A protein has these predicted regions:
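Cytosolic catalytic domains that perform sulfur/thiol-centered chemistry
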Residues: 1-159
Length: 159
């Protein structure tokens, strides 16, 4: 994936990369304006879907907390996070500087594109969008897992 020109990463290619020696970090950015189920109201929107099924080893990204700033109402619903806040989120996800990442969602790429754009804006080079997102991955009967993925958090500050 080094030197990505095309931001889209195919499911078949990703499945091969996941079996390799240096798999990319998978970032699940599924998000909706409102929770789908009443029991999801206590968690970030999209987290319930993540717990039910996600790509193997994926990390859940909360659009409202990780990909947005928290300013005044006049700043809009999802203003940009500060570089410091974004770096803290990236480190919490376990993404090390120089590591490859693939971002996906289930809403046509809107949330994933925001994560991709912010990662690129703040200096990530090898980041891609999963072509077709979670829906295509599942439709092709590719492996998923449930629950919380275990991953190594980044030890060094990111950017």
């Amino acid at each position: 994936m080094s030197g990505v020109e095309n931001p889209l990463f195919g499911a078949e290619q990703l499945q091969r990369e996941l079996a390799g020696a240096k798999p990319p970090l998978l970032l699940d950015v599924r998000w909706q304006l409102v929770a789908k189920r009443p029991e999801d109201a206590a968690h970030p929107v999209g987290y319930g879907d993540f717990l039910e099924a996600h790509l193997p080893g994926a990390v859940f990204i909360d659009l409202a907390q990780d990909l947005a700033g928290h300013g005044e109402p006049v700043d809009g619903r999802h203003p940009l996070p500060t570089p410091e806040d974004f770096a803290a989120s990236v480190a919490r996800w376990g993404l090390a500087e120089g590591q490859e990442a693939v971002v996906y969602d289930d809403q046509g790429g809107m949330s994933a594109a925001r994560a991709w754009w912010l990662l690129k804006l703040f200096g990530a080079h090898d980041v891609a969008l999963l072509d077709g997102g979670m829906a295509k991955w599942v439709a092709e009967n590719r492996p998923t897992e449930s629950g919380i993925s275990s991953f190594a958090k980044s030890r060094a500050p990111w950017r």
